[in-house]
């Protein structure tokens, strides 16, 4: 196998492994609050929203140290160990206890930070400037396809269910745990890419030991430098402006990945299909994500108008979705009790409108995330690690805050928070993009400012 073929093989395996893991984890997150509401009728008392708040809070803090962990352990072993913790979190739902549920939430927060840092490292070492776009697209498509399979199973398995029984819960989460473990094991199929600088056969063992020691020192130096650069980048004008946009992506991530599915499952007006509709909602979020990511990935090379039109499309799509959700869903749906809510929405609650909104949420999310990743890669091509660490830090801490307030705020207040952040986040993105375009037009190096 040629070096290029080996790298492409690694990217495909990386994407398939993440597809299996996140088929399990995203399905788990989508149904967690609904399952826990059924559990709260027993001796178990917990909140899926609180669990996700813990996960994203720990995740954001852990981003500060994970580059050092990956540098020492290596990306492959880091991803494998993280996968085990993901599987452990999912397995907790088979027979949950509050202490194990929240403890696992802490561990998976750390594991998530390690996993995504290692994923970025693995993607980078298996790509060059010519293949990074293609490889990112392959990984994105495989990752987002995870939204289909688990949610498709939920749709058919929970058809006609109004309450989730112990047998239903165990069957689903045993299957999801096995799926997650399959993805975890797949990381061992990733091969080490051929090194461009291989040690000569005539080199002595002393020379090799010296290079190993120097390599370890270099890894430590790089980790410290990245840590320092992260703090310096935090206070630059461009990063502060983009942080508002990033904060919005964290809030809407919480909404479409956890809150919206819960709202659908709690709306009794949907009848016997309310629980299975959670799975169908997840499928259409995935369709929106994949369609948007694929479309904007293909258009990126021929886009004469920059990134702003895509972001504008994203915010318009999201505002339409928020307005329809406001009209179609009862206000108390996010915090409804175990039996759901019989409250009326402003219009007669429609399953078709609910699923349309799922698609719009996914499409809008892909607009924002693809363009944020693009502009960060452009502005900070020489400091990509600390730049993306800040991106993940801001996004995850805002997601944690949103999961926390989702326990208490009615639907219309949650939508209002997203509308405010979405509006100002779009304006701030436009400002940075206009400055970047102006520097390109003048032939200046934007990275020098």
Curated annotation (Swiss-Prot):
Its main location: membrane. InterPro entries: Ion_channel_UNC-93, MFS_trans_sf, UNC-93-like_regulator. The chain crosses the membrane at residues 8-28, 53-73, 74-94, 96-116, 138-158, 170-190, 239-259, 277-297, 309-329, 359-379, 385-405, 410-430. It holds the Pfam family UNC-93. Coiled coil: none annotated. The modification Phosphoserine is found at residue 204. The keyword Transmembrane applies. It is a multi-pass membrane protein. Keywords: Glycoprotein, Membrane, Phosphoprotein, Transmembrane, Transmembrane helix. CDD domains: MFS_MFSD11. It comes from the Eukaryota. It is found in: Membrane. Glycans are attached at residue 40. GO terms for cellular component: membrane. PANTHER family: ET TRANSLATION PRODUCT-RELATED, UNC93-LIKE PROTEIN MFSD11. Belongs to the unc-93 family. This is UNC93-like protein MFSD11. It comes from Homo sapiens (Human).
């Amino acid at each position: 196998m040629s070096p290029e073929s080996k790298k492409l093989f690694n990217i495909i395996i990386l994407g398939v492994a993440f597809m299996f893991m996140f088929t399990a984890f995203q399905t788990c997150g989508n149904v967690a609050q609904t399952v826990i509401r059924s559990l709260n009728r027993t001796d178990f008392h917990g909140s899926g929203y609180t669990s996700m708040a813990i996960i994203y809070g720990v995740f954001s803090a852990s981003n500060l140290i994970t580059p050092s962990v990956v540098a020492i352990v290596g990306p492959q072993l880091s991803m494998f160990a993280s996968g085990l913790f993901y599987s452990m979190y999912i397995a907790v739902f088979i027979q949950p206890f509050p202490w194990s549920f929240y403890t696992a939430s802490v561990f998976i927060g750390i594991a998530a930070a390690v996993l995504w840092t290692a994923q970025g490292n693995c993607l980078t070492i298996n790509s060059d400037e010519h293949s990074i776009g293609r490889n990112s697209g392959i990984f994105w498509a495989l990752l987002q396809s995870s939204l289909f399979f688990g949610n498709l199973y939920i749709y058919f398995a929970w058809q006609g269910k109004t309450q989730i029984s112990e047998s239903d819960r165990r069957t689903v989460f045993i299957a999801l745990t096995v799926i997650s473990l399959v993805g975890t094991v797949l990381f061992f199929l990733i091969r080490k890419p051929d090194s461009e600088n291989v040690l000569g056969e005539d080199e002595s063992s002393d020379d090799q030991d010296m290079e190993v020691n120097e390599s370890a020192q270099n890894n430590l130096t790089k980790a410290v430098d990245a840590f320092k650069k992260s703090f310096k980048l935090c206070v630059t004008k461009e990063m502060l402006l983009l942080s508002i946009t990033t904060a919005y992506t964290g809030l809407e991530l919480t909404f479409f990945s956890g809150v919206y599915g819960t709202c659908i499952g709690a709306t009794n007006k949907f009848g016997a299909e309310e629980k299975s509709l959670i799975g169908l909602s997840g499928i259409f979020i995935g369709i929106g994500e994949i369609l948007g990511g694929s479309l904007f990935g293909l258009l990126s090379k021929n886009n004469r108008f920059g990134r702003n039109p895509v972001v504008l499309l994203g915010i318009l799509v999201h505002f339409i979705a928020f307005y329809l959700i406001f009209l179609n869903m009862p206000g108390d749906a996010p915090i409804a009790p175990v039996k759901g809510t019989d409250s009326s929405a402003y219009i007669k609650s429609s399953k078709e409108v609910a699923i349309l909104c799922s698609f719009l949420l996914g499409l809008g999310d892909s607009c924002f995330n693809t363009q944020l990743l693009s502009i960060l890669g452009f502005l900070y091509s020489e400091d990509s690690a600390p730049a993306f660490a800040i991106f993940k830090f801001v996004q995850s801490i805002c997601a944690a805050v949103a999961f926390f307030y989702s326990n208490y705020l009615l639907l219309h207040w949650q939508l209002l928070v997203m509308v405010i952040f979405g509006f100002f986040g779009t304006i701030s993105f436009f400002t940075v993009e206009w400055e970047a375009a102006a520097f390109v037009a003048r032939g200046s190096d934007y990275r020098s400012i």
